Each structure stands twice: as C-alpha cells, then as structure tokens.
C-alpha cells in the first residue's frame, strides 16, 4: 500500500544494539551466574550458550517484558535462561543417570538474585517460551517444553498458595498465638515453631508419599492429617478450642470425641482416605524423626483427655520444647536433600512469609487461580457468593439428595480448598458407588446395534483410561525416599481415578443413549455407538472432570486430548451434551467445562493440528491452499491398537476385540473427520445437532440470534458425521458446512460478550462503536477467516476496536485499548505481546518465515492489508466516503454496503444488575489524560494505522463520569430479559462472564448521542 505505516521503532529504541553494549550484557549475565548463583563451570558454559542464542530476542522485546524498562527486562531474561538451563540440563542428566554438577539451585534462589517475585516470573515466562522456543528446541530437543514443566510448576505454586492459606486459617482457629503463662517473645516463638513444624511435616508427606500425583484433594487430606497430629501433640495451653464444642467436634461417643471423623466432617474429607494418610504421616514421623510410636489408647496425657484414642498414635516429646527444635532441623535437612538439584520451587517460602518473593496479583494454575499473598480472605471468595448463592442455579433434585449440600459447611463462604473438597465429595458419594461396568439398560442399547458392541466399548474404555491414568512409573518425576512405596501409591491413585472416570462415562453414556432413543423413537444407535471419536471424546470429558475434581498438577488440560488422540474441536462437540445429561454435576465442574469450552473457542481450535481445519477445507474450499501451506491440518487419529501398544496395555481379563469391530473403528471410519469420503448410508447420522454446538452458559448469557435450523432437536450422533455428507436439513449444505457455520456462530457469540465488556470498560457510550466492532469482527471471520489461523480471537477483537475507532474518528489509542484489555478477566499478556505472523505469504520488506510480533505490528502489517476493504464497508454503513478522505461518520444514515453480506446486529445480551455482581469486581473510573497530535503519517491513511504514544480518549469530567455511574447503579430501567435461575439445564453463570456482562443494555442504546440501533437482520 502507498500509505505510510508508522512502526513500533520508538519502542525498539529502548535497547542498545551496539557491540559494546552486547558485551556488557554478557558480562552482567556472567556475574549473575558465577557470583550471584555460584554455578559450576559446566553449568555456566551451557547457560552462556543459551543466553547468546537468545540475546537478540531480549534486545528486540525489551519494551514488552515486565515494566518495559531495560534493567528489569534484563533481570527477567537472566532468570528465564538460568531456570531453563537448570531444568532442562537436569532432565538430560536424569535420563543419562549422571550426578548433577552444580549445587542445589532452586527457582527461589534464582529469583532472589534477580530481584523478582514468583508471580511476576510466571506472568512473563509464557512469552519467553514462545520467543525462545525454536532455540530451546535446537539445544534440548523437541520435547523441551514438556521437560521444562513450567505450567506444572505454576499450577503447583498456585495450589501451595491456596493450601498454605488454608493451613494458616485452620491453625489459627485451633491454636493460640500466645500463652499467658510465658512472655510474649517466647510465646511467639512457640507459635511459629509449631506452625512451621506442621508445614514441614506436610512437605515431607508431599515428597515421600504423594510423589507424582500432587493433587489438591490428596494434599488437603495430608494437611488435615497434620492438623490431627498437632491437636494431639501441641501443649494444651496453646489450644484455641474446647473438645466439648459440639459444632467443631460433631462426632462424639462414649469414649469421647472421634477426632478424625470430626475433622472429616469439617473439611469434607473422606474418613477412609484420611486414616490411610494418617498412617503415612505416622510412618514419616517414625522414620525421619526417629520417634517411637505409642498406641494412644495405652498412653495417658492431658492432650488426649476427652478424645477417643482408638486407632490413634502418640509420640512422646514430639512437641516438647526440648525436642521441637531438633525435629525442625531434621525436617529442614530432609526437605533440602529432597529438592537438591531439582530446580523446583522451595515450598518452605510459604511458611517464611516472604511476601517480596511470593509477589502479588492474580495467577492461574490448572482449574483454579490465586491472587498474591496480600489478598484477604474476603477477596478469595466474595462475601456475597457462597455455595448457596443466588448466582448459582438451583441444582437438580438428584444433587440435593446425594448429600453434597447437606454438610454443615454449606453456607460457609467458599474457598478453593473447600470447593475442591465439596466436589470430591460428589465424586465419592455419587459416582464411586456405581458399577464399573455398563448397566443393564446401557447393555441393552449396546446389544441393540447392528452387532453387539459391548465388548468394544468396554475394551476401548480401559485402554483410553489407562493411557490417561498410567499405572506404571513412566514419566516418573522427582521421587525421593522409598521409590517402591511412592510408585505403589501412584498406582493406587491412578486406579482409583480410572474407576471414577469409567463409572462417570458409563453413567452419562447411558443418559445420552436414552435421550437419543427418545428423539429417534428407536433403540438401534449403531451410528453413535460405533463412532470411535465420539467415545474418545466422552472418555476424555469424564477423565477431565475427575482430574479437575482432584486439581491434579501433573496432568493439566489439554493432557486428555494428547493421550486420547482427539483434538480441541472434537471435544467441543460433547461438552454441552455432557453437562445436560449429568444433572447432578456440581456447580464447579459445570464451571470448569464451560471455561474449557471458552478456551477451546478462543484459541485452541485455531491452533495447528486442529481437526477444525479438516472440516474447513470441505466447507470453505478457497481456504484449502492457505491451510495446507501453513500445515494446519490434523494428523489422523491414532488407532486404539497403537495407543494400547504405546502404553504397553495388558488386555488380561478384558473381552477380545473382534475382527469386524477392528475394521469398523479404525481411523477414517465412523465419523473420523480426517477421512471425509465415507458415503451417506444412514439418515439418522446426517443431521447436525444444534445442542452439541452450544453451551448452556452461553445460551443463557448470550440469549440472542437463534441458529437457523427449524428442525426439532436432532440426534447427537450426527455431530460426528463425516464432513462431506449432505445435510438434508441444511438447505443443500454438507455436514461440514453446517458444522462450521454453527461453530462460527459460537465464535461470534463469545466475541459479542468480550466486545461488550471492552466497550463498557472503555466507557465508550456510543452504540455505533459496539455495533461496528461486532460487525467488523463478523465480516473478518466470514471473509478473511485466515486472519484467525494460529491466533487468539482477542487479537482480532483488539484490532477491530482500533480500526473502528480510527475510521469513526474516536480518540482511542491502542495503548488505551490494551490498558483496559489487561483488566478483562480472560486477559493474558501474550495475547497482545506475541501474535503469530507468516511473512512468506506477502510483501514484508524482505522478511520471510514465521515469527511472533506485538499486536501493533500485526495490525499494521497483516490485519489492515487484509481487512481494510471490510473496514471501509463497515464505516460506509451510515457514512459517505469521498475520494481518499477519511470517511466521516453520519449517524443519520443506517444502510449497509450493498457489496457486503448481511451480518447480524449486535445481539441483545441479558441485563445484569450490579447488585448481583461479586463485591470483588470494581467499577473503574479512568483518570483524565492529555492528547497528542499524530503527525507521523499522511492524513489519508492515518485512519487505519496504529502508532505507539497516540492520544488517549478524552473523558468527561470526573463528576460527570461518576454521576453517570451512579445513574446506572440506581436508575430505573426497563428490563426486557432476565436470567432463569430455576432451569437446571442452563448451566452456570461464571464470575468471568458476570464481570464481562456488567451493565449490559439488552440491546437498548446507552448512548446520549441518539445514535439509532442498527436494524439489519440475518439471512432468513
């Protein structure tokens, strides 16, 4: 294009790229390694090699790291490189069974030297992983990211943050912080030592007993066992409880308080699991501290008064002043030996209260998130949102009768730990008692197919679940102490999780078959029950719910996709149906599935290797060349036999797989999306199910623009039909076309919510801004679909915002857009810092290959050349374009460019009262900012391009802004839509969706400018 394109060169001026400065940076890194970290010469040589290989990335991205200052960016990069070398070289040595050649360097030591905190480190690490990935792959192999285990370490940090707070609260409830009989200083020391002893004993459990599967539920059981040890052994004068307290110790008998049963009742733990954990804890005390165990029933001590001592162990002098300090020293040394040379997190940091090292701010890990150490309890869980909050839909009768809501804690404010334990109780009380084989009703469905598929279903389930929950020591992580005992516990844990997932799979499969039979008025469900991909999706969904319940650190999503051979696009087809057909599913698991669906839609289905691209080549043949050029197509789904061989599966005790069934479930058959040439022979498999492409949460929060289908609810099995099959209900469309259209409608719905949230946060009251951003997004998705390839939909939304702002002459800079986007619940910094580009397809100043750039570079170089015609069309809906002048906004016209396809108006989102929003969500009032005149580009083109440092939005006075906010909070509005909290099937209103839907307008214009609503309707 002839237009001048302002670049981000101003940001690059922050770094120095002279040879002398490069040498200086290397000198500083050398000092960091040799003086600061005292690494060995071999470790230094490896570190300096990686640093030299990635130094150019640091210099090119200084402004995008941390606060953008060179000094801080440098410290981050030093930490990234040091941590990478430590973890990856350690894994190589482990595989070669070599001894480590440096001291026991941990992540905490690296961060202390770099003057960084843990939260900030994990926030910035993803862009280093993206940028340095090719270099790390060259040095350490293609599996470097799995061996780095950065995501697992982050999830581990989040879990430990939550557990440490849980332990601290519980300890303060049970024990005094001072003793009236001793001086204050001594009492503080006692409290600190007892508190520290409990945490170190818990860490010993994690190291020696929990091993690979350090899930939140198991760890909570460990903490409760530690509390039991403390209650029995901490001197009575430090107690903050009375054993006669009927609310705290509810389990009593003739022999006194049943301590373990009472703790289980309070913390929703399994008594059987707690007793097993207590046994491990007692063994550790005997083995590590060399304390002699006594049967508590045979020992007299005031600590044991009024306690039923049957089955309890007592250790003499365990908590007495004479031995407490030596016990602490032994536990400290044991832990140091355990983590030596592993480069992992020093988990003692949570008891040391090193706030400067822990950091502050939000951080997510797995299915939960945490805010920094300064966060108060009422911020962990909003005081207005309890387990029985009106924000939660009423559960089905089944969930009320399973005992989940019947606990004494049902009205306590929910914490991450209590929520996890409540969910685990559902799994324990509702799912675990079920049979581990198909029920008679399910067997009838399986036997009613063209041939009996019962054996196939059973064998497949065992193979896939064995792949997800391996029982052998493959992939064993850091194991210290007794390897045999830890492997045994791993195997027991894996077997328990397999059984839970298996029982849940059979239960939901039966419910789905019953529903399908009612729709079809037949019991022959051959097309569905012989579909390999469908069953794998169901098994993956069941396993993911089990993993999410236990909050497992070492198998984070998308592990279930990788181990079952399916893709994100496949899984998205069953999520909604799974929720609808398991009425007792707890609130948190519904929330988890809905959040997964959002993750799938926003980025994962657009990643390389997604089966969505295989359908897209059928539905949009014009995109085939670009899809093939970028190598985006999914590989064939691995066969069941291949998975069985890979995991060394033993089929002993399982029914054999018939030769017929082997043929029928091989890749490419039964709806395999990668083999679309199968002829249509079964009408039941032709229709595409509407419900399999919509989420219950989004159905309620995004109640607008119903899908085009006028047919009654079609069968589930059709969602997995071969893409080239004709869809008789789709107006001549193939199943791929219908499926992609419905998939695109889901993307548009998600974008609508996020656009609306950004408009409200930006305080852009003009209705046409929201309408035009949404219109442009739809046009880009429909006509420039390749802009989404390998990208995040938020990247396109941000570009649409800026493009519409420029064409509409609204003073809104990219800097301000990103500043407000950072406050969105779904924001991740890498979204605007690292956007995928492929330079080989266009004229880009001689640049070739693939790269990741910042959002402004992507906007100028990629987005605008592709989307400028669409942007002009969107701007011309109500404006007049004259020559090369920037289009002027004319709100008196409400037309649509004849050349553009009709698009849906901005949907009518449900109105949400601010009073129903968590108190943790703030209403932001941005300060006044000054504006600048941009003279870097010509007048004719500056409507399209972005520059760093452009003027920000000119707000009204603070008094007017506050008045407007008060009017919204207190004003009377006509509400045309409402949330139905009585419909069990509609799912859950998650916090993030509530936050994003704050002050929604129900389609009414919030502008004071009088701009009319757009009235275009979708195609009939």
Swiss-Prot record:
Residues 415-616 are annotated as: Domain A. Its main location: nucleus. It is found in: Nucleus. GO terms for cellular component: chromatin; nucleus; transcription regulator complex. Residues 382-391, 398-409 have a biased composition (Polar residues). Residues 617-737 are annotated as: Spacer. This is Retinoblastoma-related protein. It comes from Ricinus communis. The gene is RBR.
